[in-house]
Curated annotation (Swiss-Prot):
InterPro entries found in the cross-reference section: Ribosomal_uL13, Ribosomal_uL13_bac-type, Ribosomal_uL13_sf
The protein's name: Large ribosomal subunit protein uL13
Underlying gene: rplM
Keywords recorded for this protein, A-Z: Ribonucleoprotein, Ribosomal protein
Subunit-level organization: Part of the 50S ribosomal subunit.
Length: 142
């Protein structure tokens, strides 16, 4: 019997919506990354994007455990000497409510063209509404 290998044009993608209200950041991110990769499907193939589309609503209501609200730091660099910027999880949640989840999920996906294609299937919204009703997303409980 030959090993099955999924073909990119034969992959069936579903849409799921996750309500992140009072959920822990890492637990939501790991489940989202798992589904974006397609590892929950029996036809998972490592070199083919077999994942589903994921919509995360209420990203502003995500929580972290312990003192990570003030202690967890995010860094970025402008490219100029001395141009490093640092912000905390709390400040990032106030300014850009979905960015912490996006960064957490992106770090859990493969690096390279396949990973970049996977992260495009993630849609994060700070509030409880989203513009993807036409896709009829199924609710996914974590």
């Amino acid at each position: 019997m030959k090993t099955f290998s999924a073909k990119p044009h034969e992959v069936k993608r579903d849409w799921y919506v996750i309500d992140a209200t009072d959920k822990v950041l890492g637990r939501v991110a790991s489940e989202v990354a798992h589904r974006l990769r397609g590892k929950h499907k029996p036809e998972f193939t490592p070199h083919v994007d077999t994942g589903d589309f994921i919509i995360v609503i209420n990203a502003a209501k995500l929580r972290v455990t312990g003192a990570k609200t003030t202690d967890k730091k995010y860094y970025r660099h402008s490219g100029y000497p001395g141009g490093i910027y640092e912000t905390t999880f709390g400040k990032m949640q106030q300014r850009f409510p979905g960015r912490a989840l996006e960064k957490a999920v992106k770090g859990m996906l493969p690096k390279g063209p396949l990973g970049y294609a996977m992260i495009k299937k993630l849609k994060v919204y700070a509030e409880g509404s989203h513009p993807h009703e036409a896709q009829q997303p199924k609710a996914l409980e974590i």
